[in-house]
């Protein structure tokens, strides 16, 4: 029954289309698949119509997939694996490019983006888009983990945004003890058993100079233990964190019920919109680190790629150049708050006047590190998720968790042969 439902969803996905109606039968029709964007995605449709005007004889049909990245990945894998995907351009998560390239599902784009132009983008997305020394996708917009904080409450108690994890714990405890508000949490983060949990764990562990799958075991255990201690020792993180994702933590923080939150930049515009209980009361900062080490935000974001066997590859490549141009990225940043992948835009006064938060995000994106750059990343992550989840709920110690995570990785290495490359510390 589940398989039948999935098949029906895959077959019906093509019906969620925008544009291209009443197409000239002689025109080249490009099908562009991407996930539903938050906010008003009309700006993308407007850009596609503009591309059609610039490229007579080409029409673009925009077909939306669910916002869930898991469901998007499932759809792409099912359709690309057969070599006859019903689309010509696709938006891919940073963690998929290696897998899709190794499988031969997407075409190399080296000549589309020469090295000199690649340097105009943040380095993390370019690293994630490169497999076997070839570029397979072009960065569309970028994300990284950030720390949100209640600026009003920190100011009231004379506390600066924390630069280290111990400082965050201290700040949260001081304010919680002073406020005596039973509904106020100190620090919320994504602890549900899913990819967001691995991102949160990586950011803490890497900010101690090591990594989850490789590197110094003692420092990695300390990082894992810190996550558990925010719940069980320091009492600054709710027990419900074991079920928390990005949206549930955003709602909690947005309702004024948390001091600190780890999340992605998308939350900023939602927290600052009219009617928000915390509008004008929040700040954004780099994630903390352990003393003597740098913050280590996990890279997120999406890139554009072309199916290997698309008969309309040249037109699709032109569309990639158009959608990743400075003008297109600028307009998307203004309209829906998605962050440009091109670095120079963060120095444009006209854009900063509209979105001043970009000034704070620039150094964070510059420091953002991809998750392990490997075609097997999803297997690595999926094997680690239940182990780290067991730590969050107290069923495993930090040592037991790390041993299990690395044991799974070693087995994968044996089965697949040196399956992953860590992003440089």
Please state what every model-predicted region is.
Residues 93-144, 169, 185-186, 197-200, ...:
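Hinge/lid segment of periplasmic solute-binding proteins
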Residues 128, 282-285, 334-386, 390, ...:
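Long, aromatic- and glycine/proline-rich binding clefts that accommodate carbohydrate-like moieties
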Residues 136-140, 145, 169-214, 258:
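Extracytoplasmic/periplasmic solute-binding protein
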Residues 5, 11-98, 161, 291, ...:
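Conserved N-terminal structural module of periplasmic/extracytoplasmic solute-binding proteins
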């Amino acid at each position: 029954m589940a398989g039948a439902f999935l098949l029906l969803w895959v077959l019906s996905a093509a019906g969620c289309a925008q544009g291209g109606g009443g197409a000239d039968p002689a025109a080249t029709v490009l099908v562009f698949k991407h996930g539903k964007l938050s906010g008003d995605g009309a700006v993308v449709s407007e850009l596609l119509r503009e591309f059609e005007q610039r490229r007579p004889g080409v029409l673009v049909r925009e077909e939306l997939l669910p916002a869930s990245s898991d469901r998007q990945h499932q759809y792409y894998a099912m359709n690309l694996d057969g070599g006859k995907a019903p689309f010509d351009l696709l938006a891919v998560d940073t963690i998929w490019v290696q897998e899709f390239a190794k499988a031969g599902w997407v075409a190399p784009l080296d000549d589309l983006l020469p090295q000199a132009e690649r340097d105009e983008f943040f380095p993390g997305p370019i690293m994630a888009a490169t497999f076997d020394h070839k570029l397979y996708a072009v960065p569309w917009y970028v994300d990284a983990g950030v720390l949100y904080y209640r600026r009003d409450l920190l100011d009231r108690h004379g506390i600066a945004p924390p630069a280290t994890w111990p400082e965050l714990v201290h700040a949260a405890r001081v304010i919680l003890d002073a406020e005596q508000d039973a509904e106020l949490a100190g620090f919320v983060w994504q602890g549900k058993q899913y990819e967001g949990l691995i991102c949160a764990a990586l950011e803490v562990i890497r900010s101690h100079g090591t990594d989850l799958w490789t590197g110094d075991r003692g420092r990695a255990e300390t990082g894992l233990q810190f996550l558990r201690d925010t719940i069980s020792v320091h009492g600054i993180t709710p027990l419900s964190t074991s079920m928390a994702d990005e949206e549930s933590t955003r709602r909690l923080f947005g309702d004024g019920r948390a001091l600190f939150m780890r999340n992605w930049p998308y939350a900023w515009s939602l927290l600052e919109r009219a009617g928000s209980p915390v509008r004008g009361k929040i700040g954004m900062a780099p994630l903390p680190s352990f003393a003597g080490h740098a913050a280590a935000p996990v890279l997120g974001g999406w890139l554009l790629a072309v199916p290997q066997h698309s008969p309309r590859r040249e037109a699709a490549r032109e569309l990639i150049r158009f959608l990743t141009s400075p003008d297109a990225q600028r307009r998307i940043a203004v309209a829906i708050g998605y962050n440009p992948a091109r670095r120079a835009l963060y120095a444009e006064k006209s854009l900063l006047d509209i979105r001043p938060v970009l000034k704070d995000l620039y150094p964070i994106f510059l420091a953002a590190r991809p998750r392990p750059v490997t075609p097997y990343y999803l297997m690595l992550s999926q094997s680690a998720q239940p182990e780290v989840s067991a730590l969050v709920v107290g069923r495993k110690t930090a040592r037991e968790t790390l041993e299990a995570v690395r044991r799974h990785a070693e087995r994968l290495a044996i089965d697949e042969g040196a399956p992953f490359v860590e992003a440089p510390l």
